[in-house]
Amino acid sequence: MAVTSWLEVLRSAEKTALLQDGKRMVHYLFPDGKEMAEEYDEKTSELLVRKWRVKNALGALGQWQLEVGEPVPSGAGSLGSELIKESNANPIFMRKDTKTSFQWRIRNLPYPKDVYSVSVAQKERCVIVRTTNKKYYKKFSIPDLDRHQLPLEDSALSFAHANCTLIISYQKPKEVMAAESELQKELKKVKTAHGSAGDCKTQ
């Protein structure tokens, strides 16, 4: 039932789509004024980016909040690049899903794999990453499971460590897989424009 309700929300949204550089960009405008923008790989339909934007109390549009995809460093000028150089040793957290798993990558974590503990906190509905040396702690939610009103399961969680990057995977429940499949069918019905990025509302 929960899957259907989230799908209905997506179906009821006003959608525009743009195809560019091998990516399908979809912009959703919901009845409550919220906006969601997604980017998919045109060939594989793999989700590359998902971000949200809401209006503030005064009705002005806020900044896009990234849910899936690689964060773009703020500040494009020389000052921005200097700031990036200064902070490039800090852990960088990002989400990049696969077809069958939600996946998060935390870069710049040099400790061996046995130092990390990754677990589900049922009451808080989040995943917690800890290190036995107390050098790193991170708590994050899985918005997809919240939207579908599905429980978090420890058994769906796994992690690996390589090249100073901790890779955390959570196997997508069958309900989410089914909803994503239905959404792809729905998106094929949306009239898709071809053109420059400036044509798309989400840019």
From Swiss-Prot:
Record GO cellular component, one term: extracellular region
Q: Name one Pfam family in it.
A: DPCD
A biological process term (GO) from this entry: lateral ventricle development
Q: What does this protein do?
A: May play a role in the formation or function of ciliated cells.
PANTHER family named among the record's database cross-references:
PROTEIN DPCD (PTHR31921:SF1)
Q: Which family does it belong to?
A: Belongs to the DPCD family.
Q: What is this protein's record name? A: Protein DPCD
Gene symbol? Dpcd
